[in-house]
């Protein structure tokens, strides 16, 4: 499904709403936004999915699309791969989903809840791209996080194939 179609689906789904466009996220100069993220923020300024459900999720506003480590850990941790992850969604209660903007892993989305963010073997890949993430979150309809269900087919861990010193 394209970003345009997902935006239309958000707009037409009860308990979901789009925020007014507010420009593109400003990111570190060494990173580039994936095309689907640019397309999304050119049309809207974030969204809330299933606002009144048990598990609402907010696609952050452009100003909140920030490097994750300073927010979640309190420092950048430049030596770790998580230093290139940006906050893309929040539950509104201090838990986050992140997206990797490293060229080799660009677009992969991770479960960055406080108890697993940046922990080898605990940071699940929950979507292969921003588009994939939004589609999965819409299909989940505000129920318990899809990647924590028993029937979830794993996409691996953020640290798979990474040499840890």
Curated annotation (Swiss-Prot):
What is the species listed in this Swiss-Prot or TrEMBL entry? Bacillus subtilis (strain 168)
Q: What is this protein called?
A: Immunity protein YokJ
Q: What does this protein do?
A: Immunity component of one of 6 LXG toxin-immunity modules in this strain. They promote kin selection, mediate competition in biofilms, and drive spatial segregation of different strains, indicating that LXG toxins may help avoid warfare between strains in biofilms. Mediates intercellular competition during biofilm formation; disruption of the operon disadvantages the bacteria, but overexpression of the cognate immunity protein restores growth in competition with wild-type. In situ neutralizes the toxic effect of cognate toxin YokI.
- The primary gene name is yokJ
State what induces this protein: Expressed on rich and minimal solid media likely in early stationary phase; not dependent on DegSU. Not expressed in liquid LB, but only under conditions that promote biofilm formation.
This protein's major location comes to cytoplasm
Assembly behavior: Probably interacts with cognate toxin YokI but not with other non-cognate toxins. The interaction inhibits the toxic activity of YokI.
- SUPFAM superfamilies found in the cross-reference section: SMI1/KNR4-like
Tell where it localizes: Cytoplasm
One Gene Ontology term, aspect cellular component: cytoplasm
Describe the disruption phenotype: Deletion of the yokI-yokJ operon has no visible growth phenotype, however it is out-competed by wild-type cells.
For this UniProt record, the keywords arranged alphabetically read as follows: Cytoplasm
Q: Which SMART domains match?
A: SMI1_KNR4
């Amino acid at each position: 499904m394209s970003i345009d179609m997902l935006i239309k689906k958000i707009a037409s789904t009860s308990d979901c709403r789009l925020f007014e466009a507010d420009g593109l996220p400003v990111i570190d100069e060494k990173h580039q936004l994936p095309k689907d993220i640019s397309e999304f923020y050119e049309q809207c300024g974030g969204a809330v999915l299933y606002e009144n459900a048990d598990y609402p999720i907010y696609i952050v506003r452009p100003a909140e699309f920030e490097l994750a480590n300073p927010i979640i850990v309190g420092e950048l941790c430049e030596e770790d791969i998580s230093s290139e992850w940006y906050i893309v969604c929040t539950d509104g209660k201090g838990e986050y989903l992140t997206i990797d903007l490293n060229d080799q892993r660009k677009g992969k989305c991770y479960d960055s809840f406080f108890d697993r963010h940046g922990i080898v073997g605990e940071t699940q890949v929950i979507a292969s791209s921003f588009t994939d993430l939004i589609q999965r979150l819409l299909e989940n309809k505000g129920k318990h996080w899809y990647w924590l269900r028993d029937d979830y087919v794993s996409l691996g861990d953020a640290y798979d194939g990474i040499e840890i010193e």
